[in-house]
């Protein structure tokens, strides 16, 4: 006998007498909640960068063109740059003799290379608008590079938006034409490449490219040297403590400095070094944004300069041992052990570095090192804001404080940079802002990496 139900398809749905098809229920109409959800997504979800960042770049491109067309160009240093270029074009190679309306040439040869191009583009001083166009493009390209860094670091759009809000920064680029903007371009590229190396565990050639970009930044203006401790530590970690590869990166940096300055090295090497890398150069007190709370006599005193340098080194060392260096290396014994391994195995890689250092830690090393240098800078002029403004969205995100406080901090910081002329109130507030943010990043920012048990284990270089 065939059992009842044997012919029924297994798993076929059946509807009993008491079962009815479910009635379709429309989702609730909650437009305000939907708007709030969309706002929260666009502000706080890093995935929304794919939407927000292209829009912000487009808006900035439009804004920069509007500023260029509606706000008058302000002559500060561009004429002096051109006068210096004309002296070089007329055959002068002694850096100590190259001068412009605002004083002697005090920037390395990368600056000369770039402004030779601008002399051709703008026909000297005849077509300043052509130079402004290039600086407008430079601003947008630099912003794109910086947004790429933000994306790799998962910085939410709510913080990334701080990168485009500075009135002073817009002026520095398209209305002033300062060389600081090109240093920022190459420094941003260097940071981007280093972050990529850490995120995707890429070594070798790409690290060399990052080192090259860094050297290019230094060859335009010395402020990039504020990154130097962080760059050296980054190379050390990315190259897995391989002594040979580290030296190779350093050699690439030096080679670029030599190549770009060949016309001046050949005839007046000492004059070039003394002028292009003059660490004792005095700054003008009246343009110092950060030290108006002290007297001019103090500002110019070498003892004040030395105290700033000592303070810079002390804070840097504290960060190195508590936040930057991997935890199993930040003791004398750990440093001695890894140093010995470097000497005994100069062509091999320490395993722990590549396994433990991530993109966020590399960015922390680079950005915080620069920010410490800014805090203790002997002088900050208005154009120097470009040195570190682009890092503020990342630092504010790392500070891990309520967003309204970040907004208040940023508005206060921006007021300091737009207060004209420089004054004691703005200088004091600027130091309060930068010190508080650095402290927050120290206490609440990303932790330093922890190396594994095999901290000095080496493997053959790939």
Swiss-Prot record:
GO terms for biological process: protein glycosylation. The keyword Membrane applies. Belongs to the glycosyltransferase ALG3 family. This is Dol-P-Man:Man(5)GlcNAc(2)-PP-Dol alpha-1,3-mannosyltransferase. It comes from Kluyveromyces lactis (strain ATCC 8585 / CBS 2359 / DSM 70799 / NBRC 1267 / NRRL Y-1140 / WM37) (Yeast). Residues 1-144, 198-217, 265-306, 378-390 are lumenal. It holds the Pfam family ALG3. Residues 1-21 are annotated as: Disordered. Pathway: Protein modification; protein glycosylation. Residues 166-176, 239-243, 328-356, 412-462 are cytoplasmic. Its main location: endoplasmic reticulum. Dol-P-Man:Man(5)GlcNAc(2)-PP-Dol alpha-1,3-mannosyltransferase that operates in the biosynthetic pathway of dolichol-linked oligosaccharides, the glycan precursors employed in protein asparagine (N)-glycosylation. The assembly of dolichol-linked oligosaccharides begins on the cytosolic side of the endoplasmic reticulum membrane and finishes in its lumen. The sequential addition of sugars to dolichol pyrophosphate produces dolichol-linked oligosaccharides containing fourteen sugars, including two GlcNAcs, nine mannoses and three glucoses.
